Curated annotation (Swiss-Prot):
Domain of life assignment: Eukaryota
Subunit and interaction comment: Homodimer.
Classification via SUPFAM superfamilies: Peptide deformylase
Catalytic activity, EC: 3.5.1.88
Positions of the catalytic residues: E215
Record-given protein name: Peptide deformylase, mitochondrial
Residues annotated as binding substrate: G71, P169, G171
Major localization class: mitochondrion
Tissue expression: Ubiquitous.
UniProt: Co(2+) binding residues: C172, H214, H218
Length: 243
């Protein structure tokens, strides 16, 4: 998920536990994709009550209402195309509605289906005027940041229109709390289908082109940290930590 700032987004190990709020259960985090051997990460500790709630209600199902974080295998796989029979159907409609819902709630400017645990080629893009105005005018001009309405693409493809590389900081909701400078092409064309199967094409430059490239990368299992200048990698809270 691309952030505006950056200035750009159960497999329980069931165990018997004593009755009590302080008790905890060790579990592995869920993913819609199996993790490679040896990189599952440490078992998390879940309180007894959270464990019980999950046991009764079951684990959340994709598309999630949260954003998957780096380390989740779903972010590293290549997303599969949506089948033609699914176009205009309830499953795709639910996915696109959830993408828009989470994107707006998180106040980010782009979101891809893999970030909600669904390895399919679907993405949503939107830069509302109100969100755009939160960026200082000089910065908006420098980064060619202009608002644009909601656009949803299914099975999109990308064509570079201007291969000049422009470098600015980016963030991502799937690498929460971090920014880095990333080079992107100045102008691109994205083409694909809307959720009803109608052909859509958009030529974009500047910040909009950056957002498109960021989200298209997600469909290929690529994160901004794979393309960043590693010396610019920044924790956005570093000053707060030192305060």
């Amino acid at each position: 998920m691309a952030r505006l700032w950056g200035a750009l987004s159960l497999w329980p190990l069931w165990a018997a536990v004593p009755w009590g709020g302080a008790a905890a259960v060790g579990v592995r985090a869920c993913s819609s994709t199996a993790a490679p051997d040896g990189v599952e990460g440490p078992a998390l500790r879940r309180s007894y009550w959270r464990h019980l709630r999950r046991l009764v209600l079951g684990p959340p199902e994709p598309p999630f209402s949260h954003v998957c974080q780096v380390g989740d295998p779903v972010l590293r796989g290549v997303a599969a195309p949506v089948e033609r029979a699914q176009l205009g159907g309830p499953e795709l409609q639910r996915l696109t509605q959830r993408l828009v819902q989470v994107m707006r709630r998180r106040r980010c400017v782009g979101l891809s289906a893999p970030q909600l645990g669904v390895p399919r080629q679907v993405l949503a893009l939107e830069l509302p005027e109100a969100l755009c105005r939160e960026c200082p005018p000089r910065q908006r001009a420098l980064r060619q940041m202009e608002p644009f309405p909601l656009r949803v693409f299914v099975n999109p493809s990308l064509r570079v229109l201007d291969s000049r590389l422009v470098t600015f900081p980016e963030g991502c909701e799937s690498v929460a709390g971090f920014l880095a400078c990333v080079p992107r092409f100045q102008a691109v064309q994205i083409s694909g289908l809307d959720p009803n199967g109608e052909q859509v094409v958009w030529q974009a430059s500047g910040w909009a082109a950056r957002i498109i490239q960021h989200e298209m990368d997600h469909l290929q299992g690529c994160l901004f940290i794979d393309k960043m200048d590693s010396r610019t990698f920044t924790n956005v809270y570093w000053m707060k930590v030192n305060d």
